[in-house]
């Protein structure tokens, strides 16, 4: 039985005017994901994936570079306006927002969505250096 030839599907680039930038700023790394309004990921970048390793991942500059790389990845979608959702206490919170603003996006709203426990799990013990 002959198989039908497999055709590669053309990837259709959709144009999105408004997007949502999800910034996950932990103490060790920063993850930047830009989605459309429905939550479908359009592009993402991390400080670790941008060439920073070890303790340099957890710097504001690494978060800035990750935001610039993520912005370059989603330029082809035609996003003009961004709503920013920041999660976590990490050092890359502010520098990521500044980098997205400098990349040419108009930031319409900044929301802090850091999960706060209503006395849930016990936190890690304090460091003794």
UniProtKB/Swiss-Prot annotation:
GO BP annotation list: translation
Domain of life, per lineage: Bacteria
Annotated Gene3D superfamilies: Ribosomal protein S11 (3.30.420.80)
InterPro entries referenced in this protein's UniProt entry, alphabetically: Ribosomal_uS11, Ribosomal_uS11_bac-type, Ribosomal_uS11_CS, Ribosomal_uS11_sf
Gene Ontology cellular component terms for the protein in this record: ribonucleoprotein complex; ribosome
One GO molecular-function entry: rRNA binding
Disulfide bonds: none
Keywords on record: Ribonucleoprotein, Ribosomal protein, RNA-binding, rRNA-binding
Annotated coiled-coil segments of the chain: none
Subunit structure: Part of the 30S ribosomal subunit. Interacts with proteins S7 and S18. Binds to IF-3.
Family under the similarity heading: Belongs to the universal ribosomal protein uS11 family.
Function: Located on the platform of the 30S subunit, it bridges several disparate RNA helices of the 16S rRNA. Forms part of the Shine-Dalgarno cleft in the 70S ribosome.
Name assigned to this protein: Small ribosomal subunit protein uS11
Annotated source species: Yersinia enterocolitica serotype O:8 / biotype 1B (strain NCTC 13174 / 8081)
């Amino acid at each position: 039985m002959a198989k039908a030839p497999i055709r590669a599907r053309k990837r259709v680039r959709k144009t999105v005017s408004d997007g949502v930038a999800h910034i996950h700023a932990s103490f060790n790394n920063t993850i930047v994901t830009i989605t459309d309004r429905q939550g479908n990921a359009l592009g993402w970048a991390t400080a670790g994936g941008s060439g920073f390793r070890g303790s340099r991942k957890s710097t504001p500059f690494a978060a800035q570079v990750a935001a610039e790389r993520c912005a370059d990845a989603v330029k082809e979608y035609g996003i003009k306006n961004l709503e920013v959702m920041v999660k976590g206490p990490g050092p890359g919170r502010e520098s990521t927002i500044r980098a997205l603003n400098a990349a040419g996006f108009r930031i319409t709203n900044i929301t802090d969505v850091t999960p706060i426990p209503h006395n849930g799990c016990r936190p890690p013990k304090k460091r003794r250096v």
